[in-house]
Amino acid sequence: MNLNGCWNGDSKHSRTGKKCLNQLGLKATTTLSIPVIVVGNITVGGTGKTPFIIWLATELQTRGYRVGIISRGYGGKADNWPQHVDSSSDPQLDGDEPVLLARATGCLVVVAPDRVAAGQALIAKEQIDVILSDDGLQHYPLNRQLEIVVIDGERGFGNGLSLPAGPLREPKSRLVDVDIVIVNDGSWEHKGAFRTKIVAQPVYQIIGSRQKSLEGFRNTTVHAIAGIAHPSRFFDLLEAAGINVIRHPLPDHAKPDAATLAFGDDLPVFVTEKDAVKCQSICHENVWCVPVKLEFDAENGDRLIQSILTNL
């Protein structure tokens, strides 16, 4: 292997130091018995990765694939790992995103800081055909058949600097080496990328059975709570639908409490899907979840799935 290429940021073989060590055989890597698709990003948080994993898992399932998901379970406080996550799991123990993924896809999700251990536990538990790794692009001990990067098309790479001075986890040249690039909303361009957008779905009461289109709240004033990496994306989505939004951003992965949802008025309270999995036990009847999904145009969606299946 070319050592210069390993460290040269302009080379198509560029890698971070960790990946270089893996490629040189100086750090152990593990290949699981079934294909692994890593869905990640090269910037910190908030690119639309979770909605894309939900979309991809659903598309693969409709084609007959048995899908499992592994995740780090960020924010989870379980004493032992790996943890098996399903729709009834506690997001306080296992993390909010894994529980959301389990509920949205029906897939078994296994969480552990060590993604190799998570993958092995998943295979031991369930008959599956493919593993989707939620994040883990930089977790190089786990070999992968396919790397997919999701980029926020509105923010791109920010100031273009690496952590902690900027948002980059890895150099921009890392995109040369991944298999597929997804650009979510915005105008950021990348040659060969698949473009998508986030679309709101009908909102529903967390406690109760009512559903309502987002347009049904046009010109209504609502409290909006978002404990996600970039809350403004959620608030902007609501405002684009003609809703008057009182913004209440929370830190990413924060757990709302009863006081968080109480504003002393009778205005509706809107929360993200990720927040909804954490606050079901403390909601009042005027708390509504705003689910979202990714949409590709028909041609791009089909072409993307074929590209993925070809690489498995």
Residue spans for each PLM region:
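A short, gly/pro- and small-residue-rich
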Residues: 144-158, 166-170, 195-202, 278-298
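Short, flexible loop segments at boundaries between secondary-structure elements
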Residues: 251-255, 286-312
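C-terminal accessory "lid"/substrate-recognition subdomains
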Residues: 156-270
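Active-site regions of enzymes building and remodeling cell-envelope glycoconjugates
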Residues: 34, 83-87, 107, 145-148, ...
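Phosphate/Mg2+-binding loops and adjacent switch elements
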Residues: 73-191
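Conserved beta-strand elements of the Class I
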Residues: 68-70, 149, 221-225
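Walker A (P-loop) phosphate-binding motif
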Residues: 23-87
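A transmembrane-helix-recognition feature enriched in membrane-embedded lipid enzymes
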Residues: 1-35
